[in-house]
Amino acid sequence: MIVGKVLVVALFLVWSVATVNQVFRWSHPLHLWRQAIEESPNKPRPWNNLGAHYLLDRAEHFAIDCFQRSTRLAQHPDRSYNERASGVSVAQTNLALLEAQRGEYDRALARLTPVMHLYKLQETIAAHAWITRQKTIASQ
């Protein structure tokens, strides 16, 4: 009877510590996506999401590395068409939007145009239209 109670208390303590540890990791998006990458280093989405959060933290060089890695991983031949389309489009759209923020409109459009024509995803088409509009406004 006592052994059972000790076991229950021990399990409760272990689970409590694990919960606190996980809450800490999830309390900041960078910790969350780094953990996701540790668990699934060959998936493009965690790399893309980590890059997006680096952008929010104004760490552009880390964001660019993450978006480029996400693109490479998404292009792996073992991925389905939908995985490739989504992974490449999202990462390249993020890179193009970053370039547009820097005023590099031609470079951003050159990056997006082939992706837009190949995969035809709405967010890429919308980003292309937005960058084109920003370029027009900037040139006036």
Put a short name on every predicted segment.
Residues 31-140:
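C-terminal luminal/periplasmic domains and tails of membrane-associated envelope-modifying transferases
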Residues 1-18:
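Signature aromatic-anchored transmembrane alpha helix within multi-pass, membrane-resident enzymes
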Residues 15-34:
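Transmembrane signal-anchor/signal-peptide helices with a preference for the extracytoplasmic
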